[in-house]
Amino acid sequence: MKQSADLKRLLTSIDHKSYPAYKDVRGAYDFNTYILSIDHVQGDPFASPSKVSIQVRHAKAGFPAELFDTPWKKTALEDYLLRCFSREIGRLSFKAKGSGKSGLIATSHPGQEVLSRTACEIGRNEITARFEVGFPAFGRTINSGELIRIFFDFLPGCVENVFFYRRQNTAEIKKRITLADDQQFIRNELKRLDLVSFVADGSILPRETGVSDRPMKGSVAFHSPDSLRITLNLPGHGPISGMAIHRGITLIVGGGYHGKST
């Protein structure tokens, strides 16, 4: 495999050449603690950004296996790492200058849902993160010095801060994993009790608008009717009460954006 120094030499050699010369840098490069893969190079600085990925082997990342030894914990950790990585690279986007999308650094930006995403995947041997980089140019003339800044000055710190356990907020990670375990416990209880849904007391259901994930300001917290209230004893959180919706036809009424579908 080619080394990071090979990438720097190649980028230096194509500086001020026509933009298609960037395609010569496609491939994987060893940065010692992680592998940088340039998977697709954009056609010009105004086209969709280039596709890039990094891989960090578990032996170097150091995340304990018990943090991702079930599908739901794995998804929770992937989601957390992706959110961290999105914030890290977002601070550096467009710090490198040029025309069009030059200097853009971005990845998937999750909403409130915790879902399995290809932007960050924990595999058998490594963690992979996929993102986009706008390869810098002035007009259609390569400005490889700015791409060297991205790959050698900006990116290593982002990877170190996010994908190495020793640099992470371990208490926050533990909280996310405990929440994932509690959520899975509730899902299992729904099946066991023949329920289709559970709405916890204290939930804030109304949204700002029909296209917003943010809670409505000044909204009233949900309070279950006594006739429908049950209590579940979660392994992490402990007892939690709320409304159980049994299998069958249930009619829910209310004003617009008041949380009926939430």
Show which residues each predicted segment covers.
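N-terminal pre-Walker A segment at the start of P-loop NTPase domains
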Residues: 205-241
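A broad, low-specificity signal marking well-ordered, structured residues that form hydrophobic/aromatic
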Residues: 52, 129, 195-196, 230, ...
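Glycine-rich phosphate-binding P-loop
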Residues: 240-262
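N-terminal accessory targeting/assembly segments
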Residues: 1-194, 205
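Generic beta-strand/beta-sheet core signal
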Residues: 132-134, 199-201, 246, 253-255
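Histidine-centered divalent-metal-coordination microenvironment in nucleic-acid enzymes
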Residues: 123, 130, 234, 239, ...
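Carboxylate/His-rich catalytic cores and anion/metal-binding grooves
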Residues: 191-195, 201, 262
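A short secondary-structure junction signal
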Residues: 143, 209-211, 256
